[in-house]
Amino acid sequence: MGKFSKQISEANRAFIAKQHMYFVATAPLSKEGRVNLSPKGLDSFKVISDTQVGYMDLVSSGNETSAHTLENGRITIMFCSYDDKPQILRLYGKGLSLIHI
C-alpha cells in the first residue's frame, strides 16, 4: 500500500536525485480534453523546499502541460526506479507556469 506525506523527506530527496528521468502529468477540466503525460529529464528538476519543487519545461507547439497548468494548476510528477528495489514516488500538487518571453 502506498504511503502519503505532506512533505518531501530526506529519503525522497535522495531518491529524486538519483533519477535520470521523471514524468509530468496534467489534465484539463473539460471532459473532452485528454490527460497529458510527458517524460522529462536532463537536469531540469529541483527540490526547493519540503513542500515545493520546480522544473524547467521546454515549450513546444501544442504544449498541453503549460495550457493545463494555466487553466487549473493540477499536476502530478512521478519518479520511478527499476533497480534491485523498484520504487515509485508521486508528487501531487498545484503547478504554476512562469512563461519567459
Listing of model-derived features with the role each one plays in the protein:
Residues P39-L96:
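A short mixed-secondary-structure module that forms the rim of ligand-binding clefts
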